Curated annotation (Swiss-Prot):
HAMAP family: LeuB_type1 (MF_01033). Keywords: Amino-acid biosynthesis, Branched-chain amino acid biosynthesis, Cytoplasm, Leucine biosynthesis, Magnesium, Manganese, Metal-binding, NAD, Oxidoreductase. Homodimer. NCBIfam families: leuB (TIGR00169). InterPro entries: IsoCit/isopropylmalate_DH_CS (IPR019818), IsoPropMal-DH-like_dom (IPR024084), Isopropylmalate_DH (IPR004429). The gene is leuB. NAD(+) binds at residues 76-89, 282-294. This is 3-isopropylmalate dehydrogenase. GO terms for biological process: L-leucine biosynthetic process.
Amino acid sequence: MSKQILILPGDGIGPEIMAEAVKVLQRIDTQHGLGFELVYDELGGAAYDKYGSPLADETLERARAADAVLLGAVGGPQWDTIDPSLRPERGLLKIRSQLGLFANLRPALLYPQLADASTLKPEVVAGLDLLILRELTGGIYFGQPRGNRTLDNGERQAYDTLPYSESEICRIAKAGFEMARLRGKKLCSVDKANVLASSQLWRAVVEEVAKDYPDIALSHMYVDNAAMQLVRAPKQFDVIVTDNMFGDILSDQASMLTGSIGMLPSASLDANSKGMYEPCHGSAPDIAGKGIANPLATILSVAMMLRYTFAQADAADAIERAVGKVLDQGLRTADIWSEGTTKVGTVAMGDAVVAAL
């Protein structure tokens, strides 16, 4: 079996956190005899600086050839003024769409050692373990037509389009039901079917797919209510499935229930479990180069990669246990530090996880 992984450190803190994730990957590779081949390239702003494009053609070909892609983060203020079509984020959108990565998995898991880090009361979030499944290659971020125009009265207007086809909804719905079957057998589909035509089709197709999953309890919720319920009573959810834009917003909201977005990994999968794995957080240019970024989300993304693309559950479990051990030792990066714990930097945190394996 081919086991090639494309490493894309990206921008901002990306190279720093990726270095620690690769250390962990290499240790687990040695321990379990997995035989991975690591290939390196650039994406985002770093790719624009090197190639003149946020995603070079040769990088895309390397991504197609690899079995999995591990990404740091993209973006930064130094690229804010370039042509919008060349912005770092466009490279991220393009690689997702070109690889057919339609299912984005964003877990929100509260580590008991970090219960005090959440802004919500401990009794509201203790034991939180939910998964948001976001459709990633359709909807308003890719819909056409989109653009800017000047109206007859001289006023500027901008417009976007939110299309979803039956097949796009069907495949993400099936993925949602399958994930729910592996977890708590509850699926909540989030839409805005009281207003949007695309959401009305979304709800209808999800209902049709549900007939093949009689063992899963399906519910529907409008996105505004879902945002409120995530704060009011987040433990009511097991798996949430939703469209691209709603999932983008709700998954960031859910991440803060856990106290730090620096703890949360994500996976973006195609129909055959090939995936791109990355932390939920951004490139954090304000702390780039300071050696204080939290690498745990990227390290946990490695665990997701081992679990979902390479079917190495034992190796994935080992990484997740090692992260738990490090937290038990009281080691914290600045974003999750609290009184009575030991503040460490990026490299020290990565070394601690390697030592705990």
